[in-house]
Design a protein with these regions (language model features):
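C-terminal motif of bacterial Sec signal peptides marking the signal peptidase cleavage site
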Residues: 16-20
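An acidic-aromatic
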Residues: 84-140
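Bacterial N-terminal signal peptides that target proteins for export
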Residues: 1-10
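C-terminal low-complexity, charged extensions that often adopt amphipathic alpha-helices
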Residues: 128-160, 278
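Gly/Pro-enriched, hydrophobic low-complexity segments
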Residues: 154-266
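One face of beta-strands
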Residues: 53-61, 73-77, 83-89, 98-100, ...
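Transmembrane beta-strands of outer-membrane beta-barrel pores
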Residues: 63-65, 91-93, 231
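N-terminal leader/targeting segments and the immediate start of mature chains
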Residues: 21-71, 270-278
């Protein structure tokens, strides 16, 4: 069980960080959505998703590594916008066994059972993944927000960066200038809710799809209590889901974690080798 929990923590963090996806859906150009112009619709999507400076929730994390069956663990998800994303894993009696912390500086993963940790900067991750990774993209995925590569919060002035098209499942917003990567967001009309985010790398079979469901009121807006992540195209498919409860925007918690000097620092490459053997 201990090894299984460790694999879950490392895999979820790495899947989030190395997220890439492609889309092959049939799209149709539109000019009006539910009585709104395309510009008004995109503005509404941005407005509906923004405005949350913090998020805390109890979390049931389910991970299926390579189709071997899902393993579930309980924990807590905490976010302070622009500062940190924390995932604490506490499967037994509320005792934390692992923690993942993502900040603008990089990623910290602490394995409390084996008293070890990994700390890696986004610069290192970019070199390793050969991709333009950044904190704001990961933050937007967890907060159910639209995003543009290399940019923080979106405003109505960013509407022109998106191409609006319809498909059978909803209204798709494609980023016009994606360079090597393509960015697509599937929204639901007339509510203008973000239902799926996708980041694609052309010419590859890899696919990461981040879906949102079970929307609930948080503050004055809707937020998904269910997030499903699937990573496809590799030899072993990986699926993860986050079932959230007790949602709040509480900020009364420690933003950054201090690592005990009794913990051993290990390299990311060592963790990758362990995962690839599974």
């Amino acid at each position: 069980m201990t090894k299984r929990i460790n694999s879950i923590v490392w895999t979820v963090v790495l899947v989030c960080v190395f997220a890439s996806c492609s889309s092959t859906k049939s799209l149709k150009k539109v000019h009006s959505i539910e009585g709104m112009t395309e510009t008004e619709y995109v503005e509404t999507v941005i407005a509906n998703a923004g405005g949350r400076d913090a998020l805390t929730a109890k979390m049931t994390l389910s991970v299926d590594l390579g189709g071997k069956g899902a393993t579930k663990v309980n924990g807590t998800l905490r976010i302070k916008k622009g500062e940190v994303i924390q995932m604490s894993i506490a499967p037994l009696l509320g005792i934390e066994v692992a923690r993942a912390e993502i900040s603008p500086d990089g990623v910290l993963v602490i394995d409390r059972m084996n008293k070890r940790y990994v700390r890696v900067s986004f610069a290192e991750l970019k070199d390793l993944a050969n991709a333009d990774l950044d904190f704001h993209t990961l933050q937007a995925l967890f907060l159910n927000e639209l995003f543009l590569p290399g940019k923080g919060d979106l405003t109505p002035r960013d509407v022109s960066a998106f191409k609006v098209e319809t498909e059978s499942e909803g209204v798709a917003l494609d980023v016009k200038k994606g360079k090597r990567f393509t960015y697509q967001f599937l929204t639901q009309a007339p509510e203008a809710l973000l239902k799926e985010s996708c980041i694609g790398l052309s010419g590859t079979p890899y696919l990461l799809r981040w879906k949102y469901d079970a929307f609930r009121t948080l503050g004055q807006k809707q937020f998904p209590a269910d997030m499903r992540v699937s990573f496809e195209g590799g030899k072993k498919p990986v699926k993860a889901s986050f079932a959230l409860s007790r949602l709040s925007m509480n900020t009364n918690w420690e933003t950054h974690t201090e690592v005990s000097n009794k913990y051993e620092k290990v390299e990311l490459g060592d963790i990758l080798k362990q995962l690839l053997k599974k």
